């Protein structure tokens, strides 16, 4: 399926000449998921993104499909139940992206009041497994380990006060890949998806929005697109879209916060599995340290943000905070700013009335001390075989019902998100977590189908989005390893090494077969390996890359987790893209400059001076 700069102008022409049923503003995970569901239902749908797909927020997360175990500190059962249930759905529709990766949660007794102790962490993990449907005999069932075992796994971790640790199931994620594979499936189903296209104005008919004006940031051309419905899924930008033309008095919905992550070499901070721990600053926060691609990254911060949404920066204050936290937890590592190889800063699109972040918990829906004690007692009785599993489930189900949002307004799609239609017809889908994206889109689809039928006489049926697999994920989710092994053979036959073929098969899912097809047909680009050349060719032909940063940062993880290799290939990537996309000498120089700026920003060169 071609999805490239070559097809981009065709899409622009098409949306100018045909009225869309639905126009989606914002190509992050929420807009991508909604566009896929709309296209699969047969709608004429277009999604416009002013940057690269996922560039604004959705590629800047902690890169987990996180179960939110910290919420169980307050027994916010409904949040965790929703999250782990939806996580299982996402793993089923995108089995090549979220991968199980058990999390280690160390426990200390010398740091004052902490999130968990050894007793409460076991209770929380048992509840977590029950909510996640993890059986006791599953290889992913939770367990506790001794201080000695913790130190065997992580010899640099703080020894004083260590009581042991809990280990429970969590999932690593490739956030940018999740977005682009939703977009690609939507395009395959007939959607028009255009990046570098900024919505600048609304078109009105009789006081109702009937389309948009947008500026093509590649050509500066302004286009008009007619649409029956327009939905705003622009993440932290939703208020800015709502403010366009100042046509409506609005109450701001968003309270964005900034999260920062830092990357060091695994030799400097050897962490064999994801680890989740209190900061030690008595600020009621927890931080992750996560291994990936022979690197370890750690974060996140969580601070209110009022700066430039397009490109939030890592500040010295952010670095100081995270270095203090990581060196407190791993005192022998002695990490300094000069050890940082890469970094990223992103915004969380939190609703103003729901400022507790995805990772740091909150007291929304917290239960009373009485309910807390009742649950603990029930679980202990179950462990001692004096209560049945059904009795525990009955208690939890009653608690979930009391905490659920069933009594809320219909506009509430899920906790931390909202769906509203304003007086001029603009629909806004805001807030939420990456894990919630499919569920949020499904909730919006119900409203969209209703409006299209009532107002325009068009009848569409939403798809079963719980089973509709995204691009690259079209295989049995219980057979990930078998599929990778089988596809890997194709890569080896195409001339790649076993290591290269396995990496690509794991990274792209079923789309690896197209990467391998390019490898078998092409000569390697000058200065690049055949594997790198095939990946770049695939990104150019099928993944709408328009800049070197699109490829090196979001379609791959090179800038974040293979920083030492980027300098060796960056010139050759630019040269290959310049030839393919027909850049002039001036355009090529601009792209080289933009890439160098992105690298300097990522490796914190300005702060290291």
Swiss-Prot record:
Subcellular location: Cytoplasm
Binding-site list for FAD: 21-49
One GO-annotated biological process of the protein: glycerol-3-phosphate catabolic process
Keywords: Cytoplasm, FAD, Flavoprotein, Glycerol metabolism, Oxidoreductase
Cross-referenced Pfam families: DAO, DAO_C
EC number assigned by the record: 1.1.3.21
InterPro entries per the UniProt record, alphabetical: DAO_C, DAO_C_sf, FAD-dep_OxRdtase, FAD/NAD-bd_sf, G3P_DH_FAD-dep
Signal sequence, start to end: none
Main location: cytoplasm
GO CC terms: cytoplasm
Cofactor: FAD
The reaction(s) this protein catalyses: sn-glycerol 3-phosphate + O2 = dihydroxyacetone phosphate + H2O2
Molecular function as annotated in GO: glycerol-3-phosphate dehydrogenase (quinone) activity; glycerol-3-phosphate oxidase activity
Similarity comment: Belongs to the FAD-dependent glycerol-3-phosphate dehydrogenase family.
Protein name as it appears in the record: Alpha-glycerophosphate oxidase
